[in-house]
């Protein structure tokens, strides 16, 4: 098997001895990220072990997670299952793999008849309307006792580390937050007041309040108390066993917790925390939560989280999960594209669910696609070594719910969970083939939604792209963005760009006619046609507080709903122009001339002499001759899976097949580097 790869010099930490990994924050490391995969215990036996082992060895896997679900058996049945776990751990350890155990807890929302039959009366996660499912609440002390026993049994089985799955979450299954009797009782204890479910719901409307903060604090304490108790249970068996958690998309805000704190609680004394980020390959294919979400949107969601945690000394890995692990539902090519984006981004280890299959009915596509790409993966890592992503800096606050001004009446569970987690700004850039980055400051940035009120001062240095809620939030903070009013419009029928002919549009939600403040230095970059009139749809305003490009819509109304309105060739050209206007004449290092459903990630070396660009095509059709706009002088120094030619000042690549990807690396002379503006 391929030897264990170490990313960076080991820190004195027991967890590093377990994973053989560093926090992955240093992009200059010569070694690649670790490759982690899972093997389901329920399918592991004497007749299947060799099948798994062969795939792990062929795939160059470093760390194995034996996955163990729903551990609620008792007596002989439980002991038999735990013996199988001990056998599996020993088998993979003897074969040279670092081996841990992945397990679930509160539940995925489906009914759990075996559990309910043994333990009737469990508290279930409850949404504002009173609906429940099979997921149990963290406030249930009986269930906590069951989980303490489970993690102790796993520790005794010989696991080097334990990873709790993303069902350790109090939202999603079935709603936004939890208002079960347990949480309502905790809220009363904290505030001295009785609350109904509906009254808690209404805390998430209008202006921020002490009551909203109190409820989120209660939610957070119930989760941290649950996790602290699990950590203590493992310590009673072996404090040398580290624990980590898989993030759900609501973990970073709606749960009321701080994920760094939660990760450190679970990790235990002397262990470096580890955290699997949220954002799975299957989301665009089978998850009903975000209809219209693209694979690029998912990748940007993971990249955003990585940006938050890059310098916090936490081991990060991604969620490359093609659930239900059938390639006719989630294409194997998507797993490879996701993998390429995260390797190009850097700073995140690879958690690739390519062995989660039944050997009796094997799904070979994921392993075979991975093996076929291994040599090129190594080349890709080299092309992006010592680089950092460039483009518009996406500004997103990790914690925002306590401070947001929210719609009245309540906007609904779906809108709340998305606005408290995903980035509408990143999705807008992605729909237009415009590269983005999630760390650094100084270059042009973008922020959508009311969360813009939380922007740090350094976000203003390079100018900002805003939607209407972001602009109004900054105005309420006393920032002069140059806007006098945003007037709601009947649905616009068309939009023109920089004085051009109007093009038909069909936006979602409310659009606005923008009215600049009197006397402001303003330029109209676009106009809506609504009710027979033309009104500004995009303004560039220069004020004493900065330079702002304002779009006449609510980004979260558009998110995952109207990609054709957001993404167009005209909009792409407009964004390139905005970048130059915000940066005082600097230019985007790279962008697509026509996105065509492709995803682009661009990265510059620290000295600016190398520009590497990854293109991915998750679509069902090939893209003929994709074209990159790259300003100034440059030369092609390396290509991977493509051919490149300069035509009319742009870089034209060979056709990109459906599910295909390619990389081009350019040498950038000093004269061109001076034209770039990057965080």
Model features per residue range: what roles?
Residues 35-44, 67-80, 129-146, 207-224, ...:
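The substrate-binding groove and active-site-proximal loops of carbohydrate-active enzymes
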Residues 78-81, 108-130, 165-203, 259-263, ...:
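Aromatic- and acidic-residue-enriched segments that line the glycan-binding/catalytic groove
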Residues 146, 157, 161, 178-243:
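Active-site neighborhood of glycoside hydrolase catalytic domains
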Residues 98-157, 195-216, 228:
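Active-site-adjacent "subsite" loops/lids of carbohydrate-active enzymes
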Residues 420, 436-440, 448-660, 666-679:
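A conserved amphipathic helix/loop scaffold
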